[in-house]
Amino acid sequence: MAKYNTKVLGFGDNVVDLYEHSHMMYPGGNCVNLCAYSKMFGVERAAYMGYFGSDDIAEFVISVLNELEIETVKCKQLVGENGWSKCTLRDGDRIFGDYNEGGVRGKTPYILDRFDLDYMKEVDFVHTGNYCYTESQLKVMKEAGIKISFDFSDDSTEEYYKQIAPDATYAFCSFDGTDEEAEDHLKKITSMGPKLAMASRGAKGCILYDGQEFFAQK
């Protein structure tokens, strides 16, 4: 039974992290992770929408999503490589190496139709990010009344923020700086349109800004 009456949808990236030092692979990607952790926390409904390749890596990700009972009814499977990235551990830190830029997902633009948008309207918000290749569809989603959660990671340029933030309802980023610098960054983000902005800062914890007050993780 669900703990939370919340419905979420991840739209965009699915990848597999290939750990070269251990010869293990793990499913991931911002949107897949959102679905997986939401399901583990007990949301009522978690769905993933995106493109899979036609290789063994794609089948592995699909099998994990099915095992977690995450909806994939709006996904498509295309001929070609699934997204992957190679990584290893060095002094306890994860170091990323080669990656294939999303595989078929990076080569195939999303074009949402009215049925896709109707499906998205069934959830409380749709999560995507700056590695999802979904930028061209954000305005269409916003105009349809869909709440958008967007992860800018730690490498989005100011120009990218100006382009994307106005369409986002909730904005997330990774930020390495002082408390004051983080707060200034979140203020700037919300001034562009999002109702909420949150910065994750590793061991320093997260800071959330709702346009009026700051909330810090202790």
Regions found by a protein language model. Give the residues of each.
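A short helix->loop->beta-strand "cap" motif at the edges of active sites that frequently abuts
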Residues: 43-44, 143-147, 192-196
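Residue-level marker for buried hydrophobic side chains located in beta-strands
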Residues: 8-10, 148, 171, 197
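Conserved N-terminal subdomain of the carbohydrate kinase-like
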Residues: 16-21, 25, 44-124
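Positively charged, low-complexity intrinsically disordered leader regions
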Residues: 1-23
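Conserved beta-alpha-beta core of the PfkB/ribokinase-like small-molecule kinase fold
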Residues: 124-188, 203-206
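Anion (oxyanion) recognition and catalysis
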Residues: 39, 66, 142, 191
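Short catalytic helix/loop segments, enriched in acidic residues and glycine
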Residues: 24-40
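Conserved phosphate-binding/catalytic region of the ribokinase-like
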Residues: 2-6, 183-218
